[in-house]
Regions:
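Intrinsically disordered, low-complexity regions enriched in acidic/Ser/Thr/Pro/Gln residues
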Residues: 1-159, 163-166
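Short, solvent-exposed amphipathic alpha-helical segments in soluble enzyme
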Residues: 49-50, 59-60, 171, 180-185, ...
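Glycine- and other small-residue-rich loops at beta-strand/loop junctions that grip anionic moieties
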Residues: 102, 168, 195-199, 221, ...
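Glycine- and Gly-Pro-enriched alpha-helical subdomains that act as flexible
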Residues: 144-200, 207, 212
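C-terminal binding/interaction regions
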Residues: 163, 223, 227-259
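Short Gly/Pro-enriched loop/turn and capping motifs at secondary-structure junctions
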Residues: 201-204, 224-226
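A conserved acidic, glycine/proline-rich C-terminal tail/linker
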Residues: 214-226
Length: 259
């Protein structure tokens, strides 16, 4: 699988020891301005590509109900305008600025961060053997990571373990937003019969995005944070961390995992 050309940039690097100068590739990071009905609402640092999905996923994760997204012909390439009829700009009391490492930087309090969503009640049950296979399946699909070593990924899997969508980005929250935006466009929301697998750790924000999308199970090779566990318990999301070598730690709603 070949990495998309917009995801990697060639740079000179000095190899030590030895001092050889060689060409290498690093992940591309650029700003994207998200607008709703022409009004700027957010700037996020992301890896270019699937920008409409990113904007849609971002809006959905903030509790908005968009109808579509487009790159306006009369604006810079790093701008996406989302169509969300009835959106009130005053509803967002702060200006969003999201970095590639922290999607909620600038949110001053937990009350400002939390997005209301129904408790996930999906009766999905999957075996540990399937759960433990997902990180390897995700890694095998990370074409840009193979070139740069510098991108996070989110994979959306069916209840049978089929990879439905994978997105890579310098920001783990962006990768998840892109997958949620893809699912919106594919008519797959809510994700009641699906599993999300993320590279790295499980943060509060990632769990919140999964809950808003209605996904019952999240899988990661890393650990969850305390707030991630608390939120998953509150929203009914099964949280599986340290998934490797046929083992997993299930922090919440363990009844969905057998074995």
């Amino acid at each position: 699988m070949e990495a998309p050309p917009y995801s990697a940039a060639a740079v000179d690097v000095v190899r030590l020891p030895g001092g050889r100068t060689e060409r290498d590739h690093v992940a591309v990071e650029e700003p994207l301005e998200i607008r709703i009905g022409g009004s700027p609402v957010a700037v996020t640092m992301r890896t270019p590509g699937h920008d409409e999905e990113l904007a849609l996923g971002f809006c959905l994760s903030e509790g908005l109900r968009p109808e579509g997204a487009r790159v306006p012909d009369d604006l810079a390439a790093n701008t996406v305008d989302v169509d969300a009829p009835g959106f009130d700009p005053a509803r967002l009391q702060r200006s969003f600025y999201t970095t590639s490492s922290c999607g909620v930087c600038g949110k001053g309090a937990l009350d400002a961060v939390a997005v209301e969503s129904p408790r996930v009640t999906a009766e999905l049950r999957i075996p540990l053997s399937l759960v433990s296979s997902l990180p390897d399946s995700l890694r095998a699909a990370q074409a840009a990571f193979a070139v740069t070593g510098g991108l996070h990924a989110t994979g959306l899997f069916s209840s049978a373990g089929e990879l439905l969508c994978v997105r890579e980005d310098v920001g783990r929250h962006n990768a998840l937003d892109k997958v949620i935006g893809w699912a919106f466009g594919a008519g797959r929301l809510p994700l009641a019969d699906s599993v999300l697998c993320v590279s790295g750790r499980l943060s509060f924000e990632l769990v919140q995005k999964a809950a808003v999308a209605g996904c019952p199970v999240m899988v990661a090779v890393g650990a969850p944070s305390s707030l991630a566990v608390d939120l998953a318990a509150d929203r009914g999301v099964t949280l599986c961390g340290f998934v490797r070598g046929g083992t997993a730690n299930v922090y919440t709603e363990a009844w969905r995992i057998s074995g």
